[in-house]
UniProtKB/Swiss-Prot annotation:
Species for this entry: Rhizobium leguminosarum bv. trifolii (strain WSM2304)
GO molecular function terms noted in the UniProt entry: rRNA binding; structural constituent of ribosome
GO BP term, example: translation
Basic and acidic residues composition-biased segments: 1-13
Keywords assigned by UniProt, alphabetized: Ribonucleoprotein, Ribosomal protein, RNA-binding, rRNA-binding
Top-rank taxon, per record: Bacteria
Stretches assigned to coiled coil: none
NCBIfam families: rplO_bact
Protein purpose: Binds to the 23S rRNA.
Composition-biased stretches (Gly residues): 21-35
The protein, known as: Large ribosomal subunit protein uL15
């Protein structure tokens, strides 16, 4: 057997049906869709319609709500901060805050502030000013000889 002798098994491939190409083709006019009705039209399915059965989105109860006042923090790991310091994008001696992280390309936007999580290790001694930090993250930063200052959340508009 040679590469040029390889072919598909008999009957494993089918040529595409060209629908609606005249009565002589055997699948002209209605093209195998039957006559009239919703299913004969293009774009058949109505999303969420289950043929008269009560659809799942109506069978299940409504639950919860979206809090429009919820704070949306940008999450940054210690590993990402350390990587930025190692790459020379972030100055460990200067104060690390949201603006510095954005300038270094660690985060894209500040949203409601930055929250630091303890994922990874931190070797550098840094002074960090952020909106939030997890307890393990604060412990790791202080263990490395750094300090953490948490910004108070802005008061809700009266």
């Amino acid at each position: 057997m040679k590469l040029n002798e390889i072919k598909d098994n008999e009957g494993s491939t089918h040529s595409r049906k060209r629908l609606g190409r005249g009565i002589g083709s055997g699948s002209g006019k209605t093209g195998g869709r039957g006559v009239k009705g919703q299913k004969s039209r293009s774009g058949v399915a109505i999303n969420g319609f289950e043929g008269g059965q009560m659809p799942i989105y109506r069978r299940l109860p409504k639950r919860g709500f979206n809090n429009i006042f919820a704070s949306d923090f940008v999450v940054v790991s210690l590993a990402r901060i350390q990587a930025a310091i190692d790459a020379g994008k972030l100055d460990a001696k200067a104060t690390v805050d949201a603006a510095a992280l954005k300038a270094a390309g660690v985060i894209r936007r500040t949203k409601d502030g930055v929250r630091v999580l303890a994922d990874g290790e931190l070797k550098a001694k840094i002074t960090i000013v952020v909106a939030g930090a997890s307890k393990p993250a604060v412990e790791k930063i202080e263990k490395a000889g750094g300090t953490v200052t948490l910004l108070s959340a802005p008061a809700a508009a009266e």
